From Swiss-Prot:
Name of this chain's protein: Tripartite motif-containing protein 64C
GO molecular function: ubiquitin protein ligase activity; zinc ion binding
GO cellular component: a single term: cytoplasm
UniProt source species: Homo sapiens
Span of domain B30.2/SPRY: 269-450
A Pfam match: SPRY
GO biological process, one term: innate immune response
Annotated zinc fingers (RING-type), start-end: 15-56
Residues where Zn(2+) binds: C92, H95, C114, H120
Coiled-coil ranges from the UniProt annotation: 191-218
Keywords: Coiled coil, Metal-binding, Zinc, Zinc-finger
Amino acid sequence: MDSDTLRVFQNELICCICVNYFIDPVTTDCVHSFCRPCLCLCSEEGRAPMRCPLCRKISEKPNFNTNVALKKLASLARQTRPQNINSSDNICVLHEETKELFCEADKRLLCGPCSESPEHMAHSHSPIGWAAEECRVQKLIKEMDYLWKINQETQNNLNQETSKFCSLVDYVSLRKVIITIQYQKMHIFLDEEEQRHLQALEREAKELFQQLQDSQVRMTQHLEGMKDMYRELWETYHMPDVELLQDVGNISARTDLAQMPKPQPVNPELTSWCITGVLDMLNNFRVDNALSTEMTPCYISLSEDVRRVIFGDDHRSAPMDPQGVESFAVWCAQAFTSGKHYWEVDVTHSSNWILGVCRDSRTADTNIVIDSDKTFFSISSKTSNHYSLSTNSPPLIQYVQRPLGWVGVFLDYDNGSVSFFDVSKGSLIYGFPPSSFSSPLRPFFCFGCT
């Protein structure tokens, strides 16, 4: 192969970003090849969508497979390139020969006679080029892959925390409104309690905002630390072989920092404060035996908008689909068309339940879709070890403590109002904004819906 052809061939093995032989090369959808670490570092802080650094075309898939053939050729090119090993620092003082071998046991560069000495005879020795390539593949690339994975996880958690913060701001504003409406229904002497309640909500919300902001700072710092460590390993990777191997003892010490615990996301939860006398007032409208004792097997499914609010980005793989585990539902024997009605349901023994009122026409269905169309439900769900409480009309996460015992439901048909209460605390869970009812509404309770 003539020198011009060889030069062209070698250029095909060089990344246009770092201008070095490829490290773990990948090929994008637009058929351009780059080092995976270079592509990661150029990916605009890891945000989607991924764009090609050369043509700026958006890649359809965020993850790319290693170009194995290109990786092998680049590795061979690195091992066969001229080694700058004839410097005075790389001459054995004892034998005055060039150190061309690397001792795996002692992590030292050796000349030929030293490698055959009694001290090193039993050890494994490798040529410098081969040993440096092994270090790159077995240590640096694996550590960089691990650090990038942690980087991506932390970035996703940071995005979630930012989303929670924005959602919580709106939720707190909304909760102020529904608390104010609830107190307006009560006697004038409760005004002072209402103000104390709102002030406590402000203080608690301020603490939660601070916790979320602190969490964002911690995650950002953790993210930057991982990126800095990743860059250090990337720079170490590109060191000349001799410097790299002389620095190999420090690699493990630096990468040990990557094992530090990741900052965990905050679970914002507001206290449900007791509203004096609310249960006494509601019991004036109590409906005895509101729900039938006869359980009907059914399948529950959540509409797309409800699933998105409850389960976030993972809503497509979340539970509660029509082909899932069979659930059991009970309805009230009576449908309401006017007046005020209050009843209580025990949810002690179920983590997954749906409670509220629905149109009377739905009672004949065994496949029930929970949406936001004239149904008013409180939904408790458990995914892995995470519990969530939400409502469906419109779909909304409830940032309050999940009730663990009896839940009270108050239907004010004439004023278009449905509210939920935590009976053990005498506190408000949520009150739907007033609307207009035009069809009969029937109490509904479903449990075991996973």
